[in-house]
Amino acid sequence: MPNWCCNELAVIGKKEEVERFYNSFKDTNEFFENNIPTPKELADVKATFSKTPDSEESNRLYEKYGATDWYYWRIENWGTKWDISELQLTEEDDNGEGNLKYYCFRFDTAWSPPEEGIRKLSELYKDVLFHLQFEEPGMCFEGFYKCMNGIVLSQLTVESYTKIDQITDNYIEEYELSLESQKEENNIINNGIEDESV
């Protein structure tokens, strides 16, 4: 039985994209499997708990998927071995104008926060800010992880109970700042300008 990591995920962005994300799993609670599915060929392979391929079939799977079984594939692509557990929708709001939507979820994951899965979700749902806060009391660590459009905006992991000061209460403002930052970064990239101060 694993240690459980407690997660809170705030998702904010354009109403259509945020609702598309919510609708992808609301009936099944298969948060990652419905968006970043485990390759069918690996789903039935018994976990070997060894990263070293030891057979021709293992070598073939590793070449094709970067993993020899479902366990290592999920660790690499979701950041956790199982999909989420104990999902709760804790908040739902908008900006009052009908164009932005905000959801906040609580859920558990096995052993660790699903950072890579959240980053990959942010690639699938454009201009949506994913802000994950987590705590793993068994191993005494906590932190946060923010990303948008597949780019990690900020992250921090510390020993538990040191109190994270960076937690925000205003997700709408945070979303607008993150979107503006993304636009500035895209302008720099598109114009071929490198900012040496970053």
Where are these regions (language model features)?
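Intrinsic low-complexity, intrinsically disordered or marginally ordered coil/linker segments
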Residues: 1-198
